[in-house]
Amino acid sequence: MTSKISYIKFIREDIRHRSWLAVFSALVLFLAMPVYSAIYIDGMKGAQTVPGNTSAFITQNIRAIFPGLINGQNAMIVCYIIFLLAVLCAATGYGHIHSREKLDFYHSLPLRRMQWFSISYLSGILIFLIPYLINSFLIIAIGNMNGILNSALAVSSLIAVLGGCLVFLLIYTTCVLAMTLTGRTVTALLAGVFLIVSPLFILTTIESLEQEFFAAYYAPPGKAFFVNLSELLSPLGLSSKLLTCTGTYFPASAGSELTGITLPELLIPLAAGIIMTVLFLILSAVLYRKYPSEAAGNALAFPRSAPVLKVLACIPGAFIITDMIHAFTGMSLEKWFFPLSILTVLILTLFVEYIYRMDLRAIWRGWKSTLISIAGVAAIVSVLQFDLIGYDSYMPDEDNVARISILPDSFSNYFIYPSEYGPDSEIYLGFYVPEEDTALACSLAETGLRNAENGIEVPNTWEYSESESSDEKYMKTLFRFQLDSGRVIYRQYPLNREQLVPAVRSLLENKEFRKTIYPVFQLNRDDVYSINFSDSYQVPVELNLTDEQRSQLLDAYEQDLLAADASTLTEGTAIGSLEINIYDPFQPGTEALQNGMTADSVLGSPNLVGLSGFDLYPEYTNTLEFLENLGYTLRTEIDPEDVENLSITLSLDSVQSAKYSELFRTLPDGSASFTQYSTGEDVRTSDPEAIRLILDAIPPSRTELLDFSEDGGDSMEIEYKDGAGIGYYF
């Protein structure tokens, strides 16, 4: 039996044989960690000379990025070095198994295989771990010398050290597994890349193909199942997740939550990283123990696994490559996806056979696994192209729907909410309708499903059918079905104005639903920093209001909004709008600002969020009278005498179709200049009569709640005599 002293001796001897790697590890980590961090922090402190940047603001920013300097989250060179050292430690520690002479020599010594495995594994860890820990604590010391270290940052830094170590162990163990699976260094490198990268690409490609082939598919940002799974089942995805979570500053005021990251979001990746590392370590040890001496020099250590590994690699590889080609070229999926996938899998299988045998004449010997790979690709493509799983045709039974939400695309452009930028915001998922309107929303979803089945496609947000009539244009609408079982299903369907407007109008008859979707009812008035007002001139003017007047204005607006007819909200023409600026509750310094400190003493300037969706209609008498009493009169049209000049930029399509030629013929002679370009035409005028005629024909537009209008690629810029100006597409 080998004693502990002997183990230490063997580990030291192994490190001595790899002394170049130990020196390299110490040098690059020293340069990339304490040296880089000292320079970076000094550079950030020098930013205090910039007007508005206070010492407190700079310190706060340094603390926010400081943990990421330790684990590589905010210093990518450290991340790359961790990966590189993991590969080198595995390759140098287990390279002997790829040489028959070295393998026979090692196994002739009075040590069991598992003892050699443990010695190589531990020495590789120490080559990285010792310099990494030393340099990590040097960074923490630099932070302390610069006066930024506090107890919360110290804890965050230790978590970052843990994250960096775990990422190294994960990648290192994965590479060790690749070494024990293969018999040559080249194939070990390919196997390592495959093990580290392929799960991430496979799972994200599944998500991509679902989006490409299923018209009704929708995955909420941050909640895509296969993307989230890739962050836990892929060494690369999990490493990225670990660096992000552990490289975050954990302020004491956050209590049990990180800045934008909850405690479970930290613990789950840590647990997943430990579990994956342990599983790969056990598998590597088992393979090392069974590693045949004759495997050295062969492509694979266990030849019987070759066909299985070939199929498992080539089928997903074909889809990954084909999907990437589609992303870069925009090729037609219906025409090219099947033949290109078959061609790709054929090339991959032949390439793998060549790697196995290193003989071009023998690449057809594995024809059975090649046929299986081709058949597998053909079957999967058929499922996708013909929707054999019935994804697009599936509609939950209304009796099984506990509640349903609806979100037309235009809502996302019309409203901005106080909670929209929060880490847990679900505003982008839609608004649950009142229980009594569940049947109405389900019926609307069924209408959208029928539209999709009839071939109506709306590929992306704000893309419409080619019909000239806005009544025949279709808008994507997201439906979220929460079933009685608790399961949540997302689908998006195309709906036109005739179908969508009456349904939304009916929903808005319910006052509680209005309170749900309009941001004024979600507003914490203590967060309001300022209110801007704009009329037909569309130039925002900050209202000079006391706190009491601000509250009275919001009261009047809420009263008008609840009293308005639903048709006004869905089909009315706004004559003005309000914009409410609030302190951003998800940015540092907001709490201090609200507690009475000036913006300059905290951040240099306030962190604000501008909220939209506060249109003014002629029926809003309380709000309009309140503004008029304060001296803010709403102008319903632009006076040409107030305009200094007006310019129109027409797209090439508009020029070639003579879309506005009739309008331009009515302009007074010589009142406008026309300049043609290869991409279109510019029209400029400062003549009041020409300006009046143009504005009558093309008035400044406002975004509507249900906006089916389509920007034609033409734009207008208006410069007023007071120096203000606006620009918009029409």
Predicted regions and their residues:
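Aromatic- and glycine-rich beta-strand/loop motifs that create alpha-glucan
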Residues: M1-F24
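Junction motif at the cytosolic side of a transmembrane helix
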Residues: T2-K4, D14, F280-C314, I347-G366
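Terminal transmembrane helical anchor/hairpin motif
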Residues: Y40-L69, F201-L287, P292-A301, F319-P339, ...
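Secretory targeting signals
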Residues: P67-G68, A75, L122-G183, T187, ...
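Long, hydrophobic alpha-helical segments
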Residues: Q73-K102, R113
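Helix-loop-helix units of permease transmembrane domains in multi-pass membrane transporters
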Residues: Y94-L126, P292, A296-G297, T546-A566, ...
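Internal/C-terminal transmembrane anchor helices
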Residues: K310-I320, L350-D392
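Function-determining sites in protein domains
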Residues: R365-I374, V383-F730
